[in-house]
Each structure stands twice: as structure tokens, then as C-alpha cells.
């Protein structure tokens, strides 16, 4: 009994040793097989990490580039808006200045025109006043020195004025016809001369002789009055008045027996 138990224990120990040795061999074999697999997996993980890093870097660079591009676009838009605003301000100010300058020029022109018209009106008034004073003076002289009545003197002055107007119209008509005749006669020539043989004077000489720019003072010829026996009387205005007798009165004053 004792020997059998020892054999069994020895056999079990040998079996356990064999199992352990087999397990060690199997473990060594499996470890040898797993090492290249682990190395290949480590290399693949390194490659994936590098690819991921590259992709992340690319994405980050693209993001930064897009962000920079957006900032540049926004800056360009901002600059364009600022420039457009400044241009609009400049154009508006320029237009306002132009409008104000145009208004000032219109006011200056209107003022000049008003001053010219006022000067002409004042000149005409002065001329009319001078003419009226001259006529009144002539009327006073004729009334004081002549034997005609006031109505006769006024009628004579009116006739003279009408005669001067008719004379001016006739001269203007003659000048216009002279110009037309000479223009049709010398049509197509570079230089032409007004016919002095037919008219005597040229239209320019006639116009200068007429002197339309001067104030026309009517000249009246006072007939010589025979001195009377009565002494001359001095008026309060220091105007010497002459008394003359009419021819009818002189004839009636003579007596039928005289002579």
C-alpha cells in the first residue's frame, strides 16, 4: 500500500512537471508569435497618429487661412465703405459750394443789372429835367423879349419838336436805304465803300453830324425888337423885360393928319 501511494505521487509530480513544461513551451511559443503582431500594430498606430496629426494641421491651417481671408475681406469692405463715405462727403460739400457760388454770382449779376438800370433811369431823369429847364428858360426869354402870346410860343415849340422828329426819321430811313443799296451793289467783295458821290456824306459822317447822344437844346431865334420910348423895367428876379409895341398898335397910334 505504501509503495503504490508513492508511485502515484511520483507519477503525479511527473505529470505536473510535464504540464508545466508544456505550458511553458506553449507560452513561449505564443509569446514569440505575439511579438511581431504587436510590433506591426505599434507601427500602424504610429502611422495613424501621424496621419491624424497631418490632417489636424491641415484643417487648422485651412481654418486660419479662411479666418485671415475673412478678416481681409472685412477690412477691404470697411475701407471701401470709408472711402465711399468720404467721397460722398466730398461730393456733397463740392456741390454745396458750387450751388452757393452760383447763387452769389446770380446775386452779383442782379445787383449790377439793378445798378445799371437805376443809373440809366437817373440819367434819363436828369436829361429830362435839363430839357425842361432849358425849355422853361427859352419860354421865359421869348415871353419876356417877344411880342407873341404863350399859346403861340408853345405851338411853335411843338412844331419844332415835330420837325426834329421827322428829320431824324428821314435821316434814319436814308441811312438804311443807303446801307442796303451799297451792300447789294458791292456784294461778294472783301471791302466796299459807301457811295459818297450820290449822298455826299457817308452814313457814319451823317450820324456823327446828327450827334444823337447830346442833349438837344432847342435854339430859337428871337426877332429884333425896336427900342421903345419907355424905360426898361427890372423884375424881382433880375430879369430885364423889354416892352415893345405891336405893329397894329403902332399903326393905330399914328394920327390921320400926321404925315
UniProtKB/Swiss-Prot annotation:
Residues 61-71 are annotated as: Calmodulin-binding. It is found in: Nucleus; Cytoplasm, Cytoskeleton. Residues 50-77 form the IQ domain. One of its GO terms (cellular component) is cytoskeleton. InterPro entries: IQ_motif_EF-hand-BS. The keyword Cytoplasm applies. Keywords: Calmodulin-binding, Cytoplasm, Cytoskeleton, Nucleus. Pfam families: IQ (PF00612). May be involved in cooperative interactions with calmodulins or calmodulin-like proteins. Recruits calmodulin proteins to microtubules, thus being a potential scaffold in cellular signaling and trafficking. May associate with nucleic acids and regulate gene expression at the transcriptional or post-transcriptional level. Binds to multiple calmodulin (CaM) in the presence of Ca(2+) and CaM-like proteins. Belongs to the IQD family. This is Protein IQ-DOMAIN 10. The lineage of its organism: Eukaryota, Viridiplantae, Streptophyta, Embryophyta, Tracheophyta.
Amino acid at each position: 500500500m505504501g509503495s503504490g501511494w508513492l508511485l502515484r505521487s511520483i507519477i503525479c509530480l511527473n505529470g505536473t512537471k510535464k504540464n508545466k513544461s508544456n505550458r511553458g513551451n506553449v507560452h513561449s511559443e505564443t509569446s514569440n508569435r505575439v511579438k511581431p503582431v504587436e510590433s506591426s500594430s505599434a507601427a500602424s498606430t504610429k502611422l495613424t497618429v501621424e496621419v491624424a496629426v497631418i490632417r489636424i494641421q491641415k484643417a487648422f491651417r485651412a481654418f486660419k487661412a479662411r479666418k485671415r481671408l475673412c478678416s481681409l475681406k472685412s477690412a477691404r469692405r470697411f475701407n471701401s465703405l470709408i472711402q465711399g463715405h468720404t467721397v460722398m462727403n466730398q461730393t456733397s460739400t463740392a456741390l454745396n459750394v458750387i450751388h452757393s457760388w452760383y447763387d452769389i454770382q446770380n446775386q452779383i449779376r442782379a445787383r449790377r443789372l439793378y445798378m445799371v438800370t437805376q443809373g440809366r433811369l437817373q440819367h434819363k431823369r436828369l436829361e429830362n429835367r435839363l430839357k425842361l429847364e432849358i425849355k422853361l428858360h427859352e419860354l421865359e426869354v421869348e415871353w419876356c423879349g417877344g411880342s407873341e402870346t404863350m399859346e403861340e410860343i408853345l405851338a411853335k415849340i411843338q412844331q419844332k419838336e415835330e420837325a426834329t422828329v421827322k428829320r431824324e426819321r428821314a435821316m434814319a430811313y436814308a441811312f438804311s436805304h443807303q446801307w442796303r443799296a451799297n451792300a447789294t451793289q458791292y456784294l461778294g467783295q472783301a471791302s466796299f465803300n459807301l457811295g459818297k458821290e450820290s449822298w455826299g456824306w457817308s452814313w457814319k459822317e451823317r450820324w456823327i453830324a446828327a450827334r444823337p447822344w447830346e442833349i438837344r437844346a432847342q435854339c430859337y431865334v428871337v426877332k429884333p425888337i425896336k427900342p421903345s420910348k419907355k424905360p426898361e423895367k427890372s423884375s424881382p428876379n433880375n430879369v430885364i423885360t423889354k416892352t415893345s409895341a405891336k405893329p397894329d398898335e403902332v399903326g393905330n397910334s399914328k394920327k390921320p393928319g400926321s404925315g
